[in-house]
Amino acid sequence: AVRVRHFCAYLMEEHGGSMKRMARQPLERLRPALLAVPGIGPETADDILLYACDKPVFVVDAYTRRIFSRHGLVSESIDYDSLRAIFESNLMADVHTFKEYHGLIVWTGKDYCRTKPNCAGCPLQPLLPGIPPTA
């Protein structure tokens, strides 16, 4: 509840309580402002930017890191901004694309790529390192 209060105070003080007014701010100014709000980290800031403000920012979460590290595409220790940069430089900078891609990652993470993997039936299982391609 404290984090929500901090965000609400920011929204009232900086944007007159208007999400629409906040969303009109340029991304280059808005992201650092959100990160300065106590309790808002990179993932939460990017969630707000993508889903509430329709800004083309890719949201990285635990599912993203887990799926892509298990498939040998990134190191488990990759930092948030580096992983985000990989997506943003390789996907079309489009809000709809980022929302859909992130949603598919969340779905895959919740259903298959959990802390304890449930690889049976996962659509990405054939892409795991060491799994021979099927004909």
For each feature predicted by the language model, list its residue ranges.
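Catalytic cores of DNA base-excision repair glycosylases
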Residues: 1-135
